[in-house]
Design a protein with these regions (language model features):
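Surface-exposed cleft-lining segments at the edges of enzyme active sites
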Residues: 117-127
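Catalytic alpha-helical scaffold of carbohydrate-active enzymes acting on polysaccharides/glycoconjugates
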Residues: 1-48, 53-113, 129-188
């Protein structure tokens, strides 16, 4: 149903471990495992990738070479702002060609007076008030800019079993936040 409705399925790794907690070889193996599962599920072509927890940063740019090697054409893995976990503020909000072969499409931000906040997917979409998300979307549309959004199955599926995200280093607060407001998603 997802494919026939015109939606794209992108790759997000199998184990959801941040890039800086893996070697390039571990990342390649984890990526391949996820790709194989998606192909078995009926995905015909994988073009897009998003790193767990937006962990593609200045220090983990080696991942672009592996993404290119595996045939990806774009990544939406950079959070171009300061964040308690990951972020690459100096990257900027513009789409950029990386390593001459793959596009990086940074996550959509809501520009506040003194800082910017991610607003268009997953945790941010679930926890921010709807007025803020709507205002952010309108801001981008008024400037003819796209809004990039994403959702995990657990963002919508309130029946999915609770689990500790490996990339959050067993931090109970961050893991608690990951499950907040799941019941509000479909209404939004």
């Amino acid at each position: 149903e997802i494919f026939s409705a015109g939606h794209e399925i992108a790759c997000h790794t199998h184990r959801h471990v941040p890039l800086d907690q893996q070697t390039p070889e571990e990342f390649r193996d984890d990526l391949r495992r996820n790709m194989d599962g998606l192909y078995k599920a009926g995905v015909e072509k994988l073009n897009g990738f998003r790193a767990p927890i937006f962990s593609l940063t200045k220090k983990t740019q080696w991942a672009y070479d592996i993404l290119i090697e595996q045939g990806f054409t774009y990544s939406s893995s950079v959070l171009p702002a300061v964040n308690p976990l990951y972020g690459w503020p100096e990257f900027g909000a513009a789409f950029r060609r990386m390593h001459d072969r793959i596009w990086e499409l940074p996550i959509t931000l809501f520009p506040w007076r003194f800082f910017s906040v991610p607003c268009a997917g997953g945790l941010y979409f679930r926890t921010l008030p709807l007025w803020m998300t709507t205002r952010a979307f309108r801001h981008h549309w008024d400037q003819s800019q796209p809004v990039l959004s994403y959702f995990h199955p657990y963002d919508i599926d309130t029946e999915q079993e609770y689990f500790m995200h490996p990339g959050l280093k067993d931090n109970r607060f961050y893991n608690w936040v990951m499950y907040q407001n799941r019941g509000t998603m479909l209404d939004k």
